[in-house]
Amino acid sequence: MCDEVSCGYTPSDKPLPEVTDGQRRSFIKGLAVLPLATVLAYPELAKASGHNSTTPVSIKTPSGGTAMGYIAMPDVTPAPTVLLIHEWWGLNDQIKSVAAEFAKQGYIALAVDMYGGEYAADSAGAKKLMNQLDPKAGTEQLVTLIDWLKNHEKSTGKVGTIGWCFGGGWSLNASIATPVDATVIYYGRVNKTADELASLNSPVLGHFGTLDKNINADMVGGFEKAMAAAGKTDLSVNWYEANHAFANPTGARYDEADAALAWERTTAFFKKHLM
């Protein structure tokens, strides 16, 4: 689903969002609120957000395996739910922070850990972890967590999926494997046939970069044609003059304006279909 060219990581050399020492200390203590982009840009803030707002969950799959993740709860329930799927690196504090942000917006948000606690420090490690994941086991993990969210005692029963890069492809895979109410894909692999898309029942929102050489116009165009052939008309594809991983504030490909626009569209999409 990913390779070292498109998903390889180079740290951002852009100026970080301004935050004072006082704001930083207050946020880490859970006494202040900062914009999501600011939290994601600072590892210490992302770590604090994930630690303060999420708790681990572990659920047995039908085959006897384990589906793991971290859940963030909203103040008001019952609430709709969102399943977040990480990039090829593994589950990190940034994704946990996004889960915390969704909880602030009124969702039960669960960030899945598809690698069972492992996290890659470089592209070679990420590729190894990705290749070690059995597709059948990965699908079972996600279906198990989606079913768990639907039946959670504080859930309305509605579920949306969202993923980035590796997770974007898995967001689509999960929605094909089991019914959900909304699917969001950030520059994920979408090379599916009409037959493979036959069981997809949710509306789909996709975010893609025109400079992305892997998840490119040919692949996305083929996806649009396959969706049409399968009779799936509720698809919104958005293009940004940006590269792969443009929504990751810690990477060199980060595009602040496009990331903000994609996030605005994502939250509006979930509000429309889940709330």
What is the predicted function of each stretch?
Residues 147-152, 156-199:
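Primarily recognizes the serine-hydrolase "nucleophile elbow" in alpha/beta-hydrolase
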Residues 1-22:
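N-terminal secretory signal peptides
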Residues 230-275:
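C-terminal catalytic histidine-bearing segment of alpha/beta-hydrolase fold enzymes
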Residues 19-46:
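N-terminal export signals
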Residues 129-151:
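Alpha/beta-hydrolase active-site loop
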Residues 79-87:
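Short beta-strand element of the alpha/beta-hydrolase
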Residues 45-74:
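N-terminal cap/lid segment of alpha/beta-hydrolase-fold proteins
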Residues 206-208:
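Short beta-strand/loop motif that positions the catalytic acidic residue
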